[in-house]
Amino acid sequence: MQTLAQTLSVQAVNASLTQLLLTLADTSKAISGAVRHGALAGVLGATEQENIQGETQKKLDVITNDMLKDALKADGNVRGLASEEEDYVVEVNAKGEYLVCFDPLDGSSNIDINSLVGTIFSVLPAPAGELNEQSFLQAGRKQVAAGYVLYGPSTMMALTTGQGTQFYTLAPDSQEFLLTDDSVQITPDTAEFAINMSNQRFWEAPMQTYIADLLLGEIGPREQSFNMRWIAAMVGDVHRVLCRGGIFSYPTDNKNPAKPFKLRLMYEANPMALLVEQAGGKASTGYETILDIQPTEIHQRVAVILGSANEVDTCLSYHGIDYSEEPSID
């Protein structure tokens, strides 16, 4: 089996991006160890702090954020970073070529129940000139790499450098990420959906109707039965979609009119959308292709509908949108 470094060499990924991706991979190994130790290391539970989103930070949120910050600061290829756990962008190395956006521990509410969590990351080219928030506000199609690391029964990385989506599995003995799927492909059709049904009454009418039709099964307009899956961690739900197809959504809702969206564009929706598109799937807000959105702020939130291409198209048809054409890639 090829190592991560060997695969990046075969893909002719340049040396600076290769080094950055290896830095992220090495740091994820350390994070995997921290997650695995859990209560034995006293890292479970919450802090008394909130992040900029107003969410109470778990101890491991802070620990993993610091681990990634320290590693990226030591990597001369990184110009700056943005994190779910940082109020503002962080300048790193003046000569760095790349910007890194990340969610250090997605699904951290799962930590205390020993369920799935992961790290999500996005790599963008660093524009010339002074570094500020505007430097990061690039559409998702500008990403030069994106991926996540899932800390489950085995530690797995999903990665794209724009040459399809690959899976790597961390070998326990060698501590190397080994290529275990060189061309992940999402099935175009599916009978599985992932959504937080407890919010159903707050959704827009198109999504309420779409889900209601799925629940009607064989007696409804879809004329087939669907199963629901929900891990409560985007990284876990998207991993399942990449492995066996499905549609995942965190749609617009009016539960809190001031916050109609849940997921963050720059370090959740964009990297996942690129992974999904590179695996043959689609990703939309319901009204706009996610990778085409021009960001307006680093912690911007968006609605997300992604997964099996034909099922995403069907969902979008309920929204009055025809996205049956292939997305254009600059």
UniProtKB/Swiss-Prot annotation:
Q: Where does substrate bind?
A: 106-109, 196, 262
Biological pathway: Carbohydrate biosynthesis; gluconeogenesis
Tell me which residues bind Mg(2+) 1: 84, 103, 105
Keyword field: Carbohydrate metabolism, Cytoplasm, Hydrolase, Magnesium, Metal-binding
- One GO cellular component term noted in the UniProt record for this chain: cytosol
Sites binding Mg(2+) 2 sit at 103, 106, 268
Does the entry feature the keyword Hydrolase, yes or no?
Answer: yes
Show the catalytic activity.
Answer: beta-D-fructose 1,6-bisphosphate + H2O = beta-D-fructose 6-phosphate + phosphate
InterPro entries attached to this UniProt entry: FBPase_C_dom, FBPase_class-1, FBPase_N, FBPtase
Q: Which Gene Ontology MF annotations are present?
A: fructose 1,6-bisphosphate 1-phosphatase activity; magnesium ion binding
Give the record's cofactor note, including how many are bound. Binds 2 magnesium ions per subunit.
EC nos? 3.1.3.11
What PANTHER family would the database entry show? FRUCTOSE-1,6-BISPHOSPHATASE-RELATED, SEDOHEPTULOSE-1,7-BISPHOSPHATASE, CHLOROPLASTIC
Name of the protein described by the UniProt record: Fructose-1,6-bisphosphatase class 1
Q: Per the UniProt entry, what species is this protein from, by scientific name?
A: Shewanella frigidimarina (strain NCIMB 400)
The gene that this protein is the product of is: fbp
